[in-house]
Every structure is written in C-alpha cells, then in structure tokens.
Amino acid sequence: MSFDLLKDINKKVHFIGIGGVSMSGLAAVLLNAGYKVSGSDSKESEITNRLKEEGAKIYIGHSKDNLQDVDVVVYTAAIPSDNPEIIKAKEDNLILMDRAEFLGQIMKGHKFNVAVAGTHGKTTTTSMISHVALSADLDPTILVGGDLDIIHGNFRVGNSEYFITEACEYKQSFLRFFPYVGIILNIDADHLDFYKDINHIKDTFKQFVRLIPNDGYIIGNADDEKVMEVLEVAKCNVLTYGINNGDIQARNIEFNEKGCATFDVFRNEEKLLSLSLNVPGMHNVSNSLSAVCLAEIFNINADSIVSGLSSFGGAHKRFEYKGTKNDITVIDDYAHHPVEIKATLSTAKKMNHNRIVCVFQPHTYTRTKTLFNDFVKCFDDCDELVLMDIYAAREKDLGEINSDQLGDAIRAHGVKCTNVHSHEEALEYVNANLSKGDLLLTVGAGDVVKVGELFLK
C-alpha cells in the first residue's frame, strides 16, 4: 500500500500508539499539512496533549470503536497482532502501514532527506545536526528519538525541503526510507533477536547505502572499519570523518574539567573552524564531525556550525545531569550496549569526581545473553557497579540468563559489583555507600533512572 503526502490530503489517518516518540512526530507532520488525524494510546501524556491542542482526536485506550471514519491506520512493531484496532482495520480493508513504511512515504514529500543511522549515537547526532540546521535557518522538519529542548519535544514541523530523522536498523526499518543524505556513525552487533550475526547487520547497512541516489551523499565514520567496508558499495558521493582518519578530522583536542572538548576541524590540510562542545566525551567529538560533514554538503557557513554545535547541551537521557545532593552528582545515560557503556564511563572518568558508582540495568534478555562477554568487560572504568535485574522490554524471561549470572562473571573479572533486585534495594545500597565527591551514574534504557531520582528526593 502506498501513501502520498501531497496527493492523499483527503485521507483520514489513525495512529495506534500516537503518544510514542516516533509516532507523535509523524502525526504532527500530517496535522501541519492539513490532514484529519486521530490516534490512541494507553495513557495520557504531554505528547498526546500537545497533539490534541494541534487538532488531533485522541483516544485513551485501544478499541475497535476508535476507528471511526478512518482511511489509513499506522502502527509500530510494538503493537501486537491481536490489538482490537489492528483487527478492525483488517476487517474493514483499511490501508494498514507500519511506522517505518509510513515515514518513508512522508520523506518522499521532501527533497533533502537526512537519515542518521548507526548502532550508537543516533539521537545525539540527530540533535546536533538539528541545532546546526536551525542555526542556519534551514527551517527543517525534525524527528528525533528523545526530547530536545530547542524544539520543545521530540519533533518539529518545518516548511522547507529539509527533513532530518533518525534511521533505526532494527528489523531493517530504515530500508523503507528515501534518504538524500545518509549518515552511518558506527556498526556493532546488536538487535541479535532479529539479526543472525554481524555480517547480516553489515549487509543490511549496505542495502541502506544503496538507497541513496547517485547525486546524494553517504557520510561515514572512517575510524570504524565496518562502516568503511559498508561504504565500498556506494554509488553516490562519499564523505568521511574521524578522529584519526577521514576527509574531515578533529585535531588539537583538549578536554575541560566537565569532559567537554575544544578542537580544530580540518578538511584534508585546510582548517575549517574551531569548535567548543557543551557535551562531554570523545564520542561526541566524533558525532559532531558528522554534523560538520552535513554542513559542508548543504553549504552551511562556519558561524552557523559553531553556533549550532556550541549551543547543544545534550539530548534528554544522554549523559543528562539530574542534580546534586550532599556533594554527590547524579547523571543518567541511556547506554544499553557494551560499546555505549564504555564510552559513557570513559566520559565520566574525564570529569573531576572522587569515585564513579554505576547503577546498571541490563536491557532485554537477548542482548544480555548474546553480548554477555562484552558486558563483563565494559565496566572497568567504574569504581563500583550496582547491577539491577534485566529489564524485559518486549521480551519474555525464558530462564536462560539473569543478572546474578552476569554479576558473578563481572566480579570474577575483577570489578567490584553488587547485585540488587529492586529500585528500593538499589537506593538503599547507594545511600549507604556513596561519599562526598562521588558520581552516581544510572545507566540503561529501561527505568533505572528512578534510582537517581529517588536518591535526589
């Protein structure tokens, strides 16, 4: 089934799970274009209220009665097949599209589509790029996977040909997109509940590169061997970046006491500009270089690049400062893959703290099982680890893996690690063991953030 943003203006569109990060942005784009939009969600939220104010009809709870006078129904992979609205849509032969397919159709209505892909860093980099595009007055439409202060949420509807979005590889979603510029930040083994192995993942990224038209661009991280291998299939223009390799590089890197970098940006041997970031970590130096690459493609001037990147203070849940209590700093981070955790702890180590006490909640049984050995080795930079039970998310516990097994292996590896089995137990432990000057770092994509929030109360 196809959907044309420009031609199908009379079609009424219903979103199942309209309050979700990805769905709400799509609904907002349609509302701005003049569509009649409805949607359902399990609970009321700031997002559903915002969409209601913009003209959407919002239903709380899922029911077949919600599909009144509807032509198109959009759903996400998280919606089960026995959802009453899915069943009703099939019975009535309505156009039924998943989120990725629908987003791809919306992208067709824009000329300069930017799709930010990679295993790690998509939300942060999409946010950086959005800051630069807004600084340059490109008036872009933006869909980002987290709240971004400058756009007061997770989406912005612009009135130009520029469209900026994250491109998730899970279940090959991004192969439904129509990018003019693709960005690949990195490639690692993840989502192994869907992918067979790293070669399957690389093959999917190669398909993503082949989506880009010959006059388009692929931007890739030259410090990542797997990314460079994938770029070999490109028929479009190729622009690379990196700390140590690539067309665009960072040199003379220095970090301040907050772990934020100042550095010079070179294209080959020509100095383009100097940057001072307000987000910490070497990985964010790398992420910012991809934004510079995009700025080069769209002829954005140096002042707009500097202004955009220096004004970016981070996306929510990405090394987010939560508060300080008794001279103990609390930071929350979304990292849930061993590579991300290592980068987060490396960033924390550059800051001026006494000890780093990390509370980690593994995310999904599949990821914990398939990346077990990597998880064992990724906590070397913390002084103490508090390990919570696995957050199931979309999965069921088959009894194959648990946090106690992971904790035993981490302790055998030489890291001080304590297993806890609830937020209250985690809070009790950190209250008893934190000292002045320590950093409490909550890490994970589930609800581990509650530990830090409870501590600050």
Curated annotation (Swiss-Prot):
Pathway: Cell wall biogenesis; peptidoglycan biosynthesis
Binding site for ATP: G118, T119, H120, G121, K122, T123, T124
EC category: ligase
Keyword Phosphoprotein: no
Subcellular localization(s) per the UniProt record: Cytoplasm
SS bond list: none
Gene3D superfamilies: Mur ligase, C-terminal domain (3.90.190.20), Mur-like, catalytic domain (3.40.1190.10), NAD(P)-binding Rossmann-like Domain (3.40.50.720)
Transmembrane segments: none
Keyword check for Oxidoreductase: no
Entry's Gene Ontology BP terms: cell division; cell wall organization; peptidoglycan biosynthetic process; regulation of cell shape
Enzyme Commission numbers on file: 6.3.2.8
One GO MF term attached to the UniProt entry: ATP binding
Reactions this protein catalyses: UDP-N-acetyl-alpha-D-muramate + L-alanine + ATP = UDP-N-acetyl-alpha-D-muramoyl-L-alanine + ADP + phosphate + H(+)
Keyword terms of this UniProt record: ATP-binding, Cell cycle, Cell division, Cell shape, Cell wall biogenesis/degradation, Cytoplasm, Ligase, Nucleotide-binding, Peptidoglycan synthesis
GO CC terms, sorted: cytoplasm
InterPro entries: Mur-like_cat_sf, Mur_ligase_C, Mur_ligase_C_dom_sf, Mur_ligase_cen, Mur_ligase_N, MurCDEF_pg_biosynth, UDP-N-AcMur_Ala_ligase_MurC
UniProt similarity note: Belongs to the MurCDEF family.
Function: Cell wall formation.
Name of protein: UDP-N-acetylmuramate--L-alanine ligase
Source organism: Clostridium perfringens (strain 13 / Type A)
Gene (name only): murC
